[in-house]
Amino acid sequence: MFPDAQVPYLAYYGTLEPPTQVKPGEGVFLEYAPMAKYKNPNSDGYRTYVPMEQKYLKPLMEMFGKENAKVLEYWIDNSMYSNYTKPPKILNVDPEPVRKDIAYYKSLGIDEITTFACYLGQDYEDLYGIPDIHAYTQAF
């Protein structure tokens, strides 16, 4: 019915390990959403992204290939940083991990990289003013 349709394999929490029983069909591409890496900061509070992505992302890329691969990041997902409660916390973007992430994804051949941006609406502006995402944009 839709011969050119595409659908993502969403690699997220319980689906980070590549499937072992099936292979991706025609039109299935990888969408990597590495939320788990934000739940495991190291002793300095800096998230340990490289080991997790080497463990999961490389095998996923081997299975799905880089064609149409996408990353859905959480760099400015203030809902997560606010523990999914209101009022939102102030957003602090550290550009260095964003730069490292982008460089790593690009080294694997992934060009389409996006991020969630949540809890940055009117209630955030009423508390803190317009969200400062300058550090995030500078990483690109």
Regions found by a protein language model. Give the residues of each.
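Catalytic-core regions of glycoside hydrolase
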Residues: 1-140
